[in-house]
Amino acid sequence: MVDFELVRTASRPRCPTQEGGVVIRSQSPVMAGINDDAAVWNKKWKEEVRLGIIPYYMFIARDTGAQAYFNVPLVRAQKLYSEAIRSTSGLCRTARGPSMSCTPGKVEVVGVQEVQGTEAFVLRFLQCRDDEWIGKVFFAKFDPKAIWCARRVLTCCGAFPALS
């Protein structure tokens, strides 16, 4: 787990960079056995705000390399995010997540919902190669074991390339 004492020792309330007007934002991957605990994320975001750092993203580690050792299923990552953000102040709620950088753009896992009698992931584009899709909500086939972009899109606003 994250050693917040080490972070606190290495940090000052405001570093010289911040005093010069630089804005610092944080992003971190959610990783099994390291920070896959809502209390860790909650504490992390609160500590960052105390240090003048803006929480930015909780992201899903890419589907490469050692991902098999550290992966967290999308449905669990979304529950961790929701639970962690629920008891923070508005200053911490700038953190988005969980998100993934896929071929068409950055996708946020919003939740799970029944769509036409089928369970589906509710996803939203945070960034996208096609500006028209930014902020659009769409659905993808639900798989409780999914650790990366769902491959089969059920519905979206207009034509949409397959996630990969």
Segments and roles (model prediction):
Residues 1-88:
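Conserved AdoMet/S-adenosylmethionine-binding subsite of the radical SAM
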Residues 49-164:
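Auxiliary Fe-S-binding modules of radical SAM enzymes
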